[in-house]
Amino acid sequence: MQVSVEATQGLERRLTISVPAEQIEKLVKDSLQREAKRARIPGFRPGKVPVTVINKRYGAAIRQDITGEVMQRNFIEAIIAEKLNPAGAPTFVPGATDGEKFEFVATFEIYPEVELKGLDAIEVEQPKASVTDADVDSMIETLRKQHATFAAVEREAADGDKVKMNFVGSVDGVEFEGGKADDFELQLGSGRMIPGFEAGILGHKAGEEFVIDVTFPEEYHAENLKGKAAKFAITLTEVLAANLPEVNDEFAALFGISEGGLEALKTEIRKNMNRELEQALKANVKEQVINGLLANNDIELPKALIDGEVNVLRQQAMQRFGGQTANMPELPAELFTEQAARRVKIGLLLGEVIKTNELKAEDERVQALIASMASAYEDPSEVVAYYNSNKELMQNMRNVALEEQAVEALLKSAKVTEKEVAFEEFMNKATGRA
């Protein structure tokens, strides 16, 4: 086997590989003979079909298969010999056979050489927060509102009430599509409607008819309504006030607390809040570390890896439609290219961090991650056992643990400052409610 390597552009490499033609001819001959022994062709006894007949019928297909196998095998031997690390499958172009040698070209991309830079320039503001008694009480109040019952009242509508109404919206005196509804139910203070809509209902009673003036936000989804002034003619048909359940042992029973009553509920709430806080704190720091790593390290990315990640993201997006994708057009790659490139870059950089620091997934950390995740389920021990018995899930958890360890390694050289934050403020930002 003779090999020449050419760097064409960027990470692309072109291998020209020559192998003795007799190697292919021998393999083709052997394959034809094997086929002749097992072929069943009318007019010939089993095992007695002439090779010339087999060659006429199947020779082209057999030669094509053998050629593919020879190219694949010799390509692997060549990249091992040349110490090349392909980032994707090669494209093979077979050449002509001159009787003495068979030559083919393999084109592919290699992984970039990654040299980590600017690790000591990564800046991280590490938030410090804890769950207080007031936070637990606030969560209980939220749960009370979620379990509220509503009853009709004859007073003016107030924040927190539910209202039922009929309305018609218009712009410049003309009704617009989607601006009309009957028996529409809305909880005041929910923020479901455009600015000014809910505020315009406050202070009105059931049976009243009135008009409110609002302006659609510039970022509104309907192009024809962006920034437009509108009027809504409203008929308020019902005002319903919330009746909140009392906070007692019966309230605790609503959440499956059979023993310990209210105090047991508070303990469970605090445990869940602490778990969510810990996850959010980790995610916040990780995002800052990753962003700093990306900003300080520019590397060339193999197109093959980006294309592969685009396909993964596209499949995930299609699955979110509930599998109803048979008649849907394929989502364009451009929708996912930026996110795919980011994920590939993160993977390559963290891979180098793991390699440089000789990191291996710590078993204790893996089990701690599984236990933390399982604690959100009714029977944590069953979930832990399921994970430990599933190789694919365990590998996923090892990858998560290894990523955590890589982030911690980067934190050691980063510029870290701590900042005290309130639980509610931090969690609102973390969940996008700020």
Swiss-Prot record:
UniProt key word Membrane: no
Catalytic activity: [protein]-peptidylproline (omega=180) = [protein]-peptidylproline (omega=0)
Keywords, comma-separated and alphabetical: Cell cycle, Cell division, Chaperone, Cytoplasm, Isomerase, Rotamase
Assigned GO CC terms: cytoplasm
Principal subcellular localization: cytoplasm
Localisation: Cytoplasm
Keyword Cell cycle tagged: yes
Gene3D superfamilies: 3.10.50.40, Trigger factor ribosome-binding domain, Trigger factor, C-terminal domain
All residue ranges annotated as the PPIase FKBP-type domain in the record: 160-245
Gene Ontology MF, one: ribosome binding
InterPro entries noted in UniProt: PPIase_dom_sf, PPIase_FKBP_dom, Trig_fac, Trigger_fac_C, Trigger_fac_C_sf, Trigger_fac_ribosome-bd_bac, Trigger_fac_ribosome-bd_sf, Trigger_fact/SurA_dom_sf
Source domain of life: Bacteria
EC number: 5.2.1.8
BP-aspect Gene Ontology terms: 'de novo' cotranslational protein folding; cell division; chaperone-mediated protein folding; protein transport; protein unfolding
Function: Involved in protein export. Acts as a chaperone by maintaining the newly synthesized protein in an open conformation. Functions as a peptidyl-prolyl cis-trans isomerase.
The record's note on its domains: Consists of 3 domains; the N-terminus binds the ribosome, the middle domain has PPIase activity, while the C-terminus has intrinsic chaperone activity on its own.
Family: Belongs to the FKBP-type PPIase family. Tig subfamily.
Name under which the protein is recorded: Trigger factor
Highest classification ranks of the organism: Bacteria, Pseudomonadati, Pseudomonadota, Gammaproteobacteria, Alteromonadales
